[in-house]
Every structure is written in C-alpha cells, then in structure tokens.
C-alpha cells in the first residue's frame, strides 16, 4: 500500500515538473519572438529615418545647385565689369546661411586699397560655392551617420596639435631668403580655408573652396565668423621710386613689399613699394575654370596653359609622369589610373582589392619604374604593390609596414623602392626579390620620402619638422632643421645637390645638401644649410617638385593654388588657381614642358609650359 502511494506521489511530482517546464519553454519562445519583432521594428525604423535624412540632404543639394547657378551668372558679370575697369578683385566666397564664411585671397591677386580715394571703392561679394551632399551611403554600424573625414585626409598623416592650434591664425604672405636682394609681397592676412567633411564611400564630394586640414582622422573642427563683402578699389597710380642698388620683387600683382632676409633666410623687415597698374592684361591669364597671375617684377619666360582635365570618382591623392613623359599615373580610392598624356585618354585602371569593398582604400602615393614597365603603389592597407603594366597584374606585394604608406619613390637605377609610413620607419626594398634590405627608424611618423637621382641618398621628412638624409647603406649623414611644423613633401634637384621641402608652416625651403659635395661628416653643419625660405602660400604646403633643369620649384597648397618659384633668384614667378579644392600633389614631366596636379576636387590636370613670346 505504501509503495503505491509513493509511486502516485512521484508521478504527481513528475507531472508538475513537466507542466512547469512546458510553461517555461513557452514563455522563452514567446520572449524570443517578441525580441525578434522588436529588433526588426527598430532596424526598420532606423532605415526609414536614414532614408528620410538622405532625401532631405538631396533636396538641399538641388536647391543649393540652383542657387549656385544663379549666383555664378552674377559673379561672372561682376568680374567682367571689374576687368573692364582694370581692377583685380579679391574673391569672396560665402557659404549657405548658418555656415562659416571664408575669404579666399590669392597672393598674386590682392588689390591695393587706396585710402586717398575712398569714392573709387566698389563692394563685391560672391555667393556660396557648390555644396555637394556627402551622405551617399549608409555608414557602417560603428560609424556615425555624419562623416567626419575631410578631403585631404586621404593623403596625409595626423596633424600635430601645434598646427591645429595655429590653423585659425592669419598669415602674411611674402618670400624670405638669404639673398637680401630678394623682396617679397606684403599681403593682408587672410583666414585659412577649410573643406567640409567627406564620406569616402560617397560618389560625390563636397567641393567648397574651403579646404580642411589633411589627416587620417578628424582633427579639426574649424569655426570662423562671417566676413563682410570685400571692398575693391583700383590700384594706385605707380610713383617713381628712388633707384636702389638692390633689385626688388613683388610676388603680388598689385601690391608688394621689400623683405630683407637674415642669415637664416627669415624676415628681417618690410618696406612697402608702389604697385604697378598699367600692365594688368600682361600679368594675368584667365579662363573659365582657372587663372594665372604673373609676377610683374619677373621677366616673362614662359606661360602655362591647361591641356587636359582628368575627372575621377574620388579625391586624387597623387600624380606622377612616366620617365618617357608619355603617361601619367594617378591614385584615388581603390584604384590607380594610367592616362595618355597626349590625348588625355584613360588607358587602364589598376584596381586595389579590398577585403571589404564598401570601405575606402586610397592609393596615397605612386611611382613609375625608370623603364616604364612597372608601377608601384602605396595604400592604406599598409602594403606596397608592384604592378606589371604589360599584364596589369601585381608582381610583388611588399609587406612589413605596420601603418599606412604615405610616400614612396623608385630609385633611378630601377633596383630599389623606398617607402615611408606612419609606423615611424622608412624602408628600402629590393625590386627583384621583394625583400626589405634596410629599415630606418624615426621618432615620429614618416610623411615624405625621396631617393636622390644619383641613388646615393635617401631623404625623409617627418612629423617632427626635421628632414633626415641617409646614405643608402643606412648611415645618417645630415639633419635639416628649420621648419616650424611637419614636413609634408620633399624633392631632390636633378643633380642631387639641392633639396626642396614643403611644410605645414606654409613655407617652402631650399636646402643645400652638404653630403652630396663630399663634405666629411665632421664638417657638416648640424642643422643643415637653408639657402632660402619662400613664403607665399596662405595655407599648408602639401606638395613640391623641382623642374628637370633645376631652375624652377613648384608647390601645391591647401589654399587651392600652385606657385612657381625661381630657384636662382628666389622670386615667385606666378600663381595658378586651377582647382576648387586643396592641391594635394604636383609633378613635372621629364622634359619640363608640362606639369600635373591632383586635387581634392576629384580632378587631375595636365598643364603645358610654353615659351613666352619675345
């Protein structure tokens, strides 16, 4: 009897346990179903919000485009009126209401304001520039829906905090060199220009004439107050100046200054000189999308003209001619392109394969082999690729860098490649074996690198403001100190005796290399020999180049301009405003008859250098 009762109790307990288990299982299933429904509804809601936001941005873009077209007609009309009056006006570009308003002033396009004739002033202003939407893709989950990167970031390493602190300060233009005979322009200070942020995955890029600082992340949140319309006045009637034993130069078309340079090539003083106003037409070449202002103090040796405009789907980070001058290579997002220089036709595209096609992979630096058979590219994935141009396939992948590749160069004998990276190293690679044969360690990230034309020296620019020169055997032979901010570009002269450098301090420096003159290490000056310092850009100098005849230096800047510098006299020969965004890369053709530029406005351009008429 007891056993039957026990069995009954056990059965009841099992039934109760089973019922409780079934209840819990049902509750768990119901909770899971509710969770899935909630997650699905939240995701759908977020997608709808993003789509609505994208539609709003697209509508704003269409409205902005319509306003821009209307204002451009008025601007062109005002420009024609000013040219008829013989006046070169500062260009004032204003962004939409509620945004920053920045003044873009070219150093060769500043009008002298005559205080004695205020009645002759004329106020002009220009409307907002094209503001394209930067939200063409839904960003990854870990990213904000608001892109934070800017156009120039695709090329450049992080910007030091000291530069960020000074980015809002005004900058007086001019030239300083060690030759006291060289004079420079004394231009009014202008507010640095900024680029709105860009979504690298987007098909369209904001093309405001307001370039922001280059960097690999968003280091800058510029703020600027609106500026009133620019008062434009006719230039002063030139007055006869007392003859001087020293020749003078003005880098501005309408105003200039005399700068006495001390031993270090920096400013020592300024004296204003009278501008020249009777040769306006001879000093300026104007086209619909570009213009050139020539320095009236320089003898006209050559003119420049636009040959080809090469459109790209993204920011153009680098440009480079082949050694025979027939081809131009450009680097942009996920691709390197090769163009025919004569026709401007794209011959082919070398696609960079990314593990995630939706993410950006910019080709930051590029170079042809001397024989033209290979093209080497440096990208954000920390790899250097050597492409065989006959097959358009990768021959070698040089791996070893631990951060992005910012700069590289091919040796002139074709045997080696040098590269610089944010991992604080510069490396020398053997082209035949694909092996790293030399590793140079630096305290800060490498931003620029070049190998001398005689293949004996490697110059390295870095974030610590110093340029280091090594022998190819790995011996440090020279340190060039003088820049006040990071060095972003360097270039050797063809005879390897001169090095040109561009920096975030807005200057270009000309260095005399002691090591190439067989000077003993004990006799080399510790800080190097700076022959001249050129100051004319209103913003960061991002790229420099030296002409094949060693006569001219070329610089590209965040201020959207390119300048030619006479390396013999130190004068600014011309300024070219040829892009709507930062000029990130410049280079000369091997014969010196052309040069190329790459910009954040999604364009590369090929320009001709034509002899001036006698």
Swiss-Prot record:
Write out the biased-composition intervals (Low complexity). Answer: 120-129
Q: Where is this region: Disordered?
A: 93-135, 163-184, 204-267
Example GO molecular function term? histone binding
Q: Where in the cell is it found?
A: Nucleus
SMART domains the record matches: WD40
UniProt feature, compositional bias: Polar residues: 164-184, 218-228, 241-260
Alphabetical list of PROSITE patterns matching this protein: WD_REPEATS_1, WD_REPEATS_2, WD_REPEATS_REGION
The UniProt keyword set, sorted, is: Nucleus, Repeat, Repressor, Transcription, Transcription regulation, WD repeat
Pfam families reported for this sequence? Tup_N, WD40
A GO CC term attached to the entry: nucleus
Predominant place of localization = nucleus
Question: Which CDD domains does the entry mention?
Answer: WD40 (cd00200)
Q: Where are the WD repeats?
A: 311-340, 358-388, 400-430, 441-471, 482-512, 536-566, 578-608
Listed under GO biological process in this entry are: negative regulation of transcription by RNA polymerase II
Concerning its family, UniProt says: Belongs to the WD repeat TUP1 family.
Q: What does this protein do?
A: Transcriptional repressor.
Q: What does the subunit comment say?
A: Interacts with fep1. Binds to histones H3 and H4.
Q: Name the chain's protein.
A: Transcriptional repressor tup11
């Amino acid at each position: 009897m007891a056993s039957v009762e026990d069995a009954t109790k056990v059965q009841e307990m099992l039934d109760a346990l089973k019922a409780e288990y079934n209840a819990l299982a049902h509750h768990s299933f119901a909770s899971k179903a509710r969770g899935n429904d909630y997650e699905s509804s939240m995701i759908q809601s977020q997608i709808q919000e993003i789509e609505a936001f994208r539609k709003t941005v697209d509508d704003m873009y269409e409205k902005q485009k319509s306003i821009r077209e209307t204002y451009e007609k008025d601007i062109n009309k005002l420009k024609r009126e000013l040219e008829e009056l013989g006046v070169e006006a500062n260009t004032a570009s204003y962004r939409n209401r509620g945004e920053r308003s920045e003044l873009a002033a070219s150093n060769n396009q500043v009008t002298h304001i005559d205080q004695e004739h205020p009645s002759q002033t004329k106020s002009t202003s220009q409307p907002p520039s094209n503001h394209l939407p930067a939200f063409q893709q839904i960003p990854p989950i870990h990213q904000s829906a608001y892109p934070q990167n800017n156009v120039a970031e695709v090329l450049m390493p992080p910007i030091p905090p000291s530069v960020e602190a000074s980015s809002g300060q005004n900058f007086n233009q001019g030239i300083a060199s060690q030759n006291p005979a060289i004079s420079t322009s004394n231009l009014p200070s202008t507010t640095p220009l900024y680029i709105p942020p860009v979504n690298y995955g987007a098909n369209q890029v904001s093309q405001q004439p307001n370039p922001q600082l280059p960097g690999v992340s968003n280091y800058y949140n510029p703020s600027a107050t609106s500026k009133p319309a620019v008062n434009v006045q006719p230039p002063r009637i030139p007055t006869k100046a007392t003859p001087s034993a020293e020749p003078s130069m003005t880098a501005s078309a309408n105003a200039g200054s005399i700068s006495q340079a001390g031993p270090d090539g920096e400013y020592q003083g300024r004296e204003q000189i009278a501008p020249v106003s009777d040769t306006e037409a001879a000093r300026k070449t104007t086209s619909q999308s570009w213009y050139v202002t020539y320095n009236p103090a320089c003898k006209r040796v050559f003119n420049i003209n636009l040959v080809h405009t090469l459109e790209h789907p993204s920011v153009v980070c680098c440009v480079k001619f082949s050694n025979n001058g027939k081809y131009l290579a450009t680097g942009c997002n996920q691709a390197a392109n090769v163009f025919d220089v004569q026709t401007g036709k794209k011959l082919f595209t070398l696609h960079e394969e990314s593990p995630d096609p939706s993410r950006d992979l910019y080709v930051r630096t590029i170079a042809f082999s001397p024989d033209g058979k290979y093209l080497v590219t440096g990208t954000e994935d920390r790899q250097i690729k050597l492409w065989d141009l006959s097959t358009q396939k990768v021959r070698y992948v040089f791996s070893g860098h631990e951060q992005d590749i910012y700069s590289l160069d091919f040796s002139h004998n074709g045997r080696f490649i040098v590269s610089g990276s944010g991992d604080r190293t510069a490396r020398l690679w053997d082209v035949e074996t694909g092996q790293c044969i030399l590793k140079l360690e630096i305290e800060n990230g490498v931003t620029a690198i070049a190998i001398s034309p005689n293949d004996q020296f490697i110059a390295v620019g870095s974030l610590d403001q110093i340029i280091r020169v090594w022998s190819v055997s790995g011996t440090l032979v020279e340190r060039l100190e003088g820049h006040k901010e990071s060095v972003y570009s360097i270039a050797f002269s063809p005879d390897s005796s001169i090095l040109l450098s561009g920096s975030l301090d807005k200057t270009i420096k000309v260095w005399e290399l002691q090591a190439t003159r067989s000077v003993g290490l004990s006799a080399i000056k510790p800080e190097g020999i700076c022959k001249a310092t050129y100051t004319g850009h209103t913003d960061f100098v991002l790229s420099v180049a030296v002409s094949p005849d060693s006569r001219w230096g070329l610089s590209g800047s965040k201020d959207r301009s390119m300048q030619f510098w006479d390396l013999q006299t130190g004068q600014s020969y011309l300024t070219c405003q040829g892009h709507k965004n930062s000029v990130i890369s410049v280079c000369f053709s091997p014969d010196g008859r052309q040069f190329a530029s790459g910009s954040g406005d999604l364009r590369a351009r090929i320009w001709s250098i034509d002899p001036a008429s006698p």
